[in-house]
Amino acid sequence: MNFISIECEELFLDYMNPNNPFGQKKDKRIENWISLLSKMPSLENAKSDLLSGVIIKGKCNGSDEKVIENLLSELLPWRKGPFKINNTFIDSEWRSNLKWDRFLELNLDLKEKTILDVGSGNGYYAFRMLGQEAKAILCLEPNLVHFSQFLAINQFIKTNKIRMLPERLETLEIKDTHFDIVFSMGLLYHQRDPSNHLNCLRNRLKEEGQLVIETIVASNEYGDYLEPKGPYASMPNVHFVHTNKGFMDLAEKEGLKVISNSTEVQTTLNEQRQTKWMPFKSYESAVLETHQDITVENFPAPKRKFYVLEKFS
């Protein structure tokens, strides 16, 4: 049985070698990642709770527990999570469960849906989508560290309903496959051409499909968008941070209408922070110590928002 479609199945032809899931990708770390994955102990009678988190429980001896923790720690930094594998708790930089809870408030039904998750990171959200009984999820994530993390976690979960390609949407050779729901979370403000990004996402929707955008929104004082022309909240490659009006106008130009949206939520040190599993600079270095609603570049601190869109009929 094909994964979503014959066309999707063919995308994985270069990644079918069980001894090298990285296909033709070039990176000096790949050999180490392959070795790490081959050494990962298995869990006997493993069971996964993907509804309340990404929680995996199974039988293994004490020494294997430590091996699992040590091997997973070699895949730093863990940006998205958390994950719990028996006694190993991966306390990621982002408490992604908080964003997921905000998504659930939109009451979007994922049951038996085919989903495209663009810029999926290590697959945390895809696992949570599976917990909501999604039919199949295609993840696109060009970052090979995140791709390796997904491969490691899925060695325990062993689902074939989620598959990840280390590719970008814009370069993907896919024309005839369309999805019930397409996700783009935390990507729009990194696009040099946000119109093209929305158009690429729209082109992957079924006629009655829904597009979920999660992004940073700027205050209305900036007109259509804030253009940092440099780092924003210590993030490089932030090109346009749209206002609510600016995003609505952009979506309309691309043949999309907003059917629902969430309230704006300001990022906090509780949601994004430095941890043992992401020991580098984090949000605490992105905002002023005395005024956490102001970035170190003197912009308003990030506020994030969900939009659900459909094609104009």
PLM regions: where:
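N-terminal accessory regions of S-adenosyl-L-methionine
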Residues: 1-96, 227-228, 271-289, 302-308
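Conserved class I S-adenosyl-L-methionine
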Residues: 113-121
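Conserved SAM-binding loop of SAM-dependent methyltransferases across substrates and taxa
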Residues: 122-133
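A short acidic, Gly/Pro-enriched loop at the edge of an enzyme's catalytic core
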Residues: 172-182
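A short SAM/SAH-binding and catalytic strip from SAM-dependent methyltransferases
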Residues: 180-194
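A short glycine-rich, Lys/Arg-flanked "PGG" loop and its adjoining helix->strand segment in the class I
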Residues: 195-210
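Short, glycine-/aromatic-enriched active-site segment of Class I SAM-dependent methyltransferases
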Residues: 216-238
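Short alpha-helix
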Residues: 239-255
